[in-house]
């Protein structure tokens, strides 16, 4: 099983969870685990998500594509681990 784990964080806004899970689904991949937290005082949203890549998909490439999407479309920071 090839999986990717990512931590995203940045200003909270509507649609983050939907965008993240939708992107993973569009790749043919499957969410294995997801946790999220909102620091209301600082308005910072955190999400840790792990997903199983579709068969034949390179997890390093998929992680890099995910990072680019999050940074460009959600204007958030990402750590891939």
Region spans (language model):
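A conserved regulatory-domain signal marking ACT and ACT-like small-molecule sensing domains
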Residues: 1-81
């Amino acid at each position: 099983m090839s999986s990717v784990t990512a931590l995203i964080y940045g200003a909270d806004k509507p649609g983050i969870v939907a965008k993240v899970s939708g992107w993973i689904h569009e790749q043919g991949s499957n969410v294995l685990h997801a946790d999220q937290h909102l620091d209301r005082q600082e308005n910072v949203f955190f999400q840790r998500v792990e997903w199983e890549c579709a068969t034949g998909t390179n997890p390093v490439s998929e992680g890099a594509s995910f990072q680019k999407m999050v940074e460009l479309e959600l204007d958030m920071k990402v750590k891939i681990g």
